[in-house]
Design a protein with these regions (language model features):
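A conserved amphipathic terminal alpha-helix motif
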Residues: 94, 122-166
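Tryptophan-centric aromatic hotspots in well-structured domains and transmembrane helices
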Residues: 25, 32-33, 48, 80, ...
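A solvent-exposed, acidic/Ser-Thr-rich amphipathic alpha-helical stretch
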Residues: 39-60
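Hydrophobic pocket/interface hotspot
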Residues: 21-25, 59, 77, 88, ...
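Hydrophobic ligand-binding cavity/cleft-lining segments
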Residues: 1-46
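Glycine-centered loop/turn positions within well-structured domains
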Residues: 19, 57, 84
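Alpha-helical scaffold segments that form or flank carboxylate-/histidine-based iron centers
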Residues: 9, 46-47, 103, 144
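Hydrophobic-ligand binding "helix-grip"
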Residues: 50, 60, 64-115, 121-123
Length: 166
């Protein structure tokens, strides 16, 4: 069992079927994922965030830096089961070699559409003074990560809603 200080769980319900939600989440991630230094390595600079949609594919961020074009791999897909779920190994830009966390994204049909659930775990394996924690420990850090994922899932829900209205 995963300890409570190791797991972030956030769910949102979107008004579309699981197959469409899966495609919008994975293929249109650059359109709904928030911008700015809290959400993208490139910060406010123009760039593209995208999944390579397959087992072993990557979550990439491509952008122009002062030293030229950059491509940063933030994740590697470890399970790919459209339209039900996928998992990827997530690495922050300040992670050392061998450090990673795991993100699972599940798409479940519900009467009002699709429940999309994010489970982000593996935090307990990182040292208490790891830079990704920004000085926060245990439950306080998990709360911050829950708010971060909550902001992203709100963006996803708004994106799906706007798309359905157009």
């Amino acid at each position: 069992m995963t300890p409570p200080s190791d797991l972030v769980t956030v769910s949102v319900t979107v008004s579309t079927d699981p197959a469409t939600a899966f495609v919008l989440f994975t293929q249109d991630i650059n359109l709904w994922w928030r911008r700015g230094p809290n959400f993208r390595i490139a910060g406010k600079q123009p760039g593209v965030l995208r999944f390579e949609p397959r087992l072993g594919g990557r979550l990439l961020e491509e952008f122009e830096s002062p030293s030229g074009p950059e491509v940063v791999t933030t994740g590697t897909i470890t399970e790919w089961q459209p339209p039900a779920r996928f998992r990827f190994e997530w690495r922050g830009v300040n992670f050392a070699p061998g450090e990673s966390t795991q993100v699972e994204v599940v798409f479940e049909e519900v009467p009002t559409g699709t429940r999309v659930t994010i489970r982000h775990s593996g935090w307990a394996a990182l040292p208490p003074d790891h830079p990704v924690r920004h000085g926060q420990q245990g439950p306080a850090f998990i709360r911050i990560m829950g708010l971060w994922w909550g902001d992203l899932m709100t963006s996803f829900r708004e994106f799906v809603t706007d798309r359905a209205g157009s």
